[in-house]
Amino acid sequence: MSFSPSIAGLSGPLSALSDALTTAPESAFASLGSVFLTRLPAAPLSAPYVVGFSAETAALLGLEPGIENDPAFAELFSGNATREWPAEALPYASVYSGHQFGVWAGQLGDGRALGLGEVEHGGRRFELQLKGAGRTPYSRMGDGRAVLRSSIREYLCSEAMHHLGIPTTRALCVIGSDQPVRRETVETAAVVTRVAPSFVRFGHFEHFYSNDRTDALRALADHVIERFYPHCREADDPYLALLNEAVISTADLMVEWQAVGFCHGVMNTDNMSILGLTIDYGPFGFMDGFDAGYICNHSDSQGRYAYRMQPQIAYWNLFCLAQGLLPLLGEKHEESVRGDKAIEDAQRVLGGFKDRFAPALERRMRAKLGLETERAGDDALANRLFEVMHANRADFTLTFRNLARVSKHDASGDAAVRDLFLDRAAFDAWVNDYRARLSEETREDAARAIAMNRVNPKFVLRNHLAETAIRRAKEKDFSEVERLAAVLRRPFDEQPEHEAYAGLPPDWASSLEVSCSS
């Protein structure tokens, strides 16, 4: 059922979009029913206005640039327009559980996010979700709001990660308001519109497992299989095949994160996507100076989610997912041995994580070093580089980008990367071995540099860049948000006119801290 566009004051493309959102197909997540979600309108947001808008993401939904200038756009994506939607088509908050910082946290759920529904365009379907849309039954002690700074960070990073080639939720827009929100200080409220094929998390499976709701667990798994992994239905054990897909996509995602120095910050099981997407951008960070133990989240005092721990934590989280799926596994076995066989099968599939992750990361590192062929000492060469980078806190992004200038013939191109290291002798020792390795390659320097610059970005969302955009946005100057977003859409291009966005962070950036408070 759809609502009358005239009731909500919408017309044209926004009316059509709203009509689609309130008419859920049978295969949509929202059609799973009240066991999985609670419907409610978004909380009112006073005098909403557009802070940032992604024309690329809008195109995925069939929206044209300029639509953000329609006053009704801010009303819809602030959630205000949903207050006039019929009860059966209201936005929804889903329930899930999970492990937070390694401890079972019990029931969680969308505490400040509301699903709007699904849109189909160009043969693809996307679910839309408003983060910061107000309290839900799962808000616990929270106020259900998001603040401007965290919303801008998520908007920018969602789009930046996509253009780095990393699986991620997308961001359509940020809607701001002067409505006050109290955190450590008084800030202003904002809503970011997330766009993804699905927002199903590991924690959804954990929830129904922990509540002994095998019927709901099966319905959820069937939904994911039918929508995203239909080939699993042909497997001997479809649910084991689903687990295998999660292992593969999660391992691949960890390769992508590690390869660009990205640290998520809150890898709780409720923040892990069943599709292997990067979701829930909170206290994330791209490393500046390389530190294997880099902790981007000020709240992570034990370093559980440090950079070097991310693959291990992803593996641990997959164990939690496997446990959640156990009641569905092993149906092909006789009842007397089903439980033991299910565990054996799950352990075997989980073992595939290392088999997938390790060689994929090795291949990525060879590409980052510009090596076409494989040699026995390549891993050691890469590891030695990281050791020297760690000892010197050499900038992660600039080190790999500038390695493209190193010549296999002489030291004429070394300076750009050498200057990033305080211990020049240590770097020289490494680069001489690197040059010797390059001499074994048939590809010439120019061709190698082009290839390296396709995998080593020049531009990433450094914290100080986001902070500058946020500070200006707080003064109602949103130009830097869009300027930075435009730069990040071309991370591998030289963009000489934007050289300042690729430089080392200023001294004041060292005092920046991000935490779970958002």
Curated annotation (Swiss-Prot):
EC numbers for this chain: 2.7.7.-, 2.7.7.108
Signal peptide span: none
Catalytic activity: L-seryl-[protein] + ATP = 3-O-(5'-adenylyl)-L-seryl-[protein] + diphosphate; L-threonyl-[protein] + ATP = 3-O-(5'-adenylyl)-L-threonyl-[protein] + diphosphate; L-tyrosyl-[protein] + ATP = O-(5'-adenylyl)-L-tyrosyl-[protein] + diphosphate; L-histidyl-[protein] + UTP = N(tele)-(5'-uridylyl)-L-histidyl-[protein] + diphosphate
Keywords: ATP-binding, Magnesium, Manganese, Metal-binding, Nucleotide-binding, Nucleotidyltransferase, Transferase
Catalytic residue positions: D270 (proton acceptor)
Keyword Transferase applies: yes
Binding sites annotated in the UniProt record for ATP: G109, G111, R112, K131, D143, G144, R194, R201, D280
Residues in coiled coil: none
Presence of keyword Metal-binding: yes
Cofactor: Mg(2+); Mn(2+)
Bridged cysteine pairs (disulfide): none
InterPro entries linked to this entry: SelO
Family of this protein: Belongs to the SELO family.
PANTHER family the record matches: PROTEIN ADENYLYLTRANSFERASE SELO, MITOCHONDRIAL
Functional note: Nucleotidyltransferase involved in the post-translational modification of proteins. It can catalyze the addition of adenosine monophosphate (AMP) or uridine monophosphate (UMP) to a protein, resulting in modifications known as AMPylation and UMPylation.
Matches recorded under HAMAP family: YdiU_SelO
UniProt-recorded name of the protein: Protein nucleotidyltransferase YdiU
Species in which this protein is naturally found: Paraburkholderia xenovorans (strain LB400)
Organism lineage: Bacteria, Pseudomonadati, Pseudomonadota, Betaproteobacteria, Burkholderiales
Gene encoding the protein: ydiU
